[in-house]
Amino acid sequence: MTPSYWNTDYVHAISNDGGRSMMGSRQENWFYNQLSASAKRGATWRIVGSQTVFSRLNESVAYGNVNPLDYDAWDGYQSNRNRTLSHLYDNGISNNVFISGDSHASWVSDVAWLDNKAYNPATGDGSIGVEFAGSAVSSPCPYGANITMALAHNATQWLVAANSELQWNDLYYRGYYELHISAEQVEARYFGFPTIVFRNTYEISLANFTIKSGANKLTRPVGGGVVESGTLKSGKTVQTNLTVDTANGTYFISHYDLEVL
């Protein structure tokens, strides 16, 4: 059962029920076996695709204190997430990269078993991997279809402060990210569209993140210490509006953030 707006209280009440499984028992056990098999055969990385955000996210700034989590994501299947984390930690399975979406926002986190394993958000020590969650290409921001950059930034400040493992969040830009994978590292490059009001080929580089092989955490300083938009834990946001027209490679300064998107 998943939230359908009218039943969120009930789904919240059963969100930590041991019988709930995001994948179902058969696929869940297959998943754990594949994680172990990948590590045993010496694969460098475990790239785990998830439709919804894996990390725990306190979003009471939007949802309120009664039901503060997104119970349509892994926060609605907490025992299943705990079993996944237990399998990774207990078996020493490292180099885990979760890639996810569905939330219409960008989130970058260390993957940590909060309340069970010690985790230091400043250094990333205690993490067992990272998560890169992407925004929507055109669907609206969950915090308001016509949200301004200022309001989006205020919300991201709250979210990053309230969630220890969350290292960066952007709510304003529609966009995508790329993964660049080598044996030594995985780099995630986030891009945003300055406007979706009309068809165009414009994009802005929002942030870049790296995980080194064997580190199991985002490389510090996270994002190189500076991002274009959103909030970066222990970093700063510098808005340049430097935009590239991907059709011809030319750069210009856009100001579409002043428009209602």
Question: Which residues fall in each region the model found?
Answer:
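Metal-dependent phosphoester/phosphodiester hydrolase catalytic core
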Residues: 1-261
